[in-house]
C-alpha cells in the first residue's frame, strides 16, 4: 500500500503524519529521519490494526497545489 504522508518543517525539526491513519505521526531532526520514522509508524499502526482484527483503510487522501497570482 502507498499512503500519502504530510511532512512539515518546524523550528526544531520536522513532523510527519498520515491523513488516512489518524494518530499515525512522527517527529525527527531531519527530513530523512522523519521519513524513516513515519515509515516505521505506518508499519506499526497497520500491524496493530491487524492484531485487533481491523482492516487497513484503503489510501484515499490526495494533495494538490493551487497557484495564485502574486500581489
Regions found by a protein language model. Give the residues of each.
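A short, exposed loop/beta-hairpin motif centered on an aromatic-Gly-Thr core
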Residues: 22-32
Amino acid at each position: 500500500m502507498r499512503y500519502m504522508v504530510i511532512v512539515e518543517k518546524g523550528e526544531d525539526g520536522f513532523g510527519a503524519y498520515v491523513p488516512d491513519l489518524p494518530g499515525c505521526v512522527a517527529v525527527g531532526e531531519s527530513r530523512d529521519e522523519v521519513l524513516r520514522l513515519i515509515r516505521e509508524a505506518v508499519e506499526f499502526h497497520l500491524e496493530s490494526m491487524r492484531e485487533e482484527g481491523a482492516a487497513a483503510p484503503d489510501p484515499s487522501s490526495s494533495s494538490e497545489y493551487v497557484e495564485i497570482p502574486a500581489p
